[in-house]
Amino acid sequence: MVLPKIKEVRAWFTGGATAEKGAGGADYHDQGNHHWIDDHIATPMSKYKQYEQSRQSFGINVLGTLVIEVEADNGQIGFAVSTAGEMGCFIVEKHLNRFIEGKCVSDIKLIHDQMLGATMYYAGSGGLVMNTISCVDLALWDLFGKVVGLPVYKLLGGAVRDEIQFYATGARPDLAKEMGFIGGKMPTHWGPHDGDKGIRKDAAMVAEYREKCGPDFWLMLDCWMSQDVNYATKLAYACAPYNLKWIEECLPPQQYEGYRELKRNAPPGMMVTSGEHHGTLQSFQTLSETGIDIMQPDVGWCGGLTTLVEVAAIAKARGQLVVPHGSSVYSHHAVITFTNTPFSEFLMTSPDCSVLRPQFDPILINEPVPVNGRIHKSVLDKPGFGVELNRDCKLKRPYTH
């Protein structure tokens, strides 16, 4: 089979700081008013009074959605979305395009390595540049799947299970249980600046939902980089009587010694997890060495599917789980091929968590949602990632090359 070459890469964006609030899409923090995802959630900025009530107040939604299209010389188009907005468009159109155009559609690893090497001097350890590279990588996998007529998970070697089971992240674990999810992960609302009073409040929330959900439903806490080791350890012990399954991302990404200490001091049986804001393979290697139980890369932020597969191998070698941060179809196609991913995350994006809404709504068409907390592999049996770009969204292409 003679494979086509990549004719053109195009970068679009929607939402972000210049758009009306609530665009949604891959920048799923960009929601409207009265949404749980922006309601007094503990963050590294919570210690400042003017930024403690809302994550949007300090600009969590300023980037917007990046859309990458890669077109082959036979006319087929692959695409993907992530969080990088207009700045990601500049990086692709003015820098990364030279490593993409003219290559065979199967040259994904070569392109990936060249993008990483060429941006090393300004990419640092992740962030915006890595989000952009991730989006390109995902678009390339989508194109390759469409060209050969296979879903991405089959390009990775095929499914190791018939379905993916999910836990739900949101403010209402009780509703998640009713919908058939295996667990519910809640955001913490208080941090070290609130002292022991904050610990008591978040522990009381866990106690409340343990009472509502019964003894066997999983409950977890997402701390979003807002704590220090001492506070996180005390919170973990305060929640231990309520059978908290894990405590997540308590510390900033690079505090590896802190994660090692937290894992060493955590209550017996309670897992320590992190990884969604790590952005290089090397950082995941170091994170794995801390001994945490679950690594949680975001496939749209960590370097794409190419890096996610490598992270899963690091975790597997150490006997750790890899459970990606919720990233919809882009993680679905990966985790159904990983033997060390027995479950996955679904992020609730409806304002009060009362209905199932596609995570990247409205940017993707045919984006699947779990049914009774599960997605069967047959749902993924479409070429590429199996979704379409919603061109009714206000897409802008600010740069060309």
Swiss-Prot record:
Top-level division of the source organism's lineage: Bacteria
Annotated signal peptide: none
UniProt keyword terms in alphabetical order: Lyase, Magnesium, Metal-binding
Biological processes, Gene Ontology terms: amino acid catabolic process; carbohydrate catabolic process
Residues annotated for Mg(2+) binding in this entry: D222, E248, E276
Note: Reaction proceeds via a syn dehydration.
Known role: Catalyzes the dehydration of L-rhamnonate to 2-keto-3-deoxy-L-rhamnonate (KDR).
Identification of the protein by name: L-rhamnonate dehydratase
Gene source species: Tolumonas auensis (strain DSM 9187 / NBRC 110442 / TA 4)
Gene: rhmD
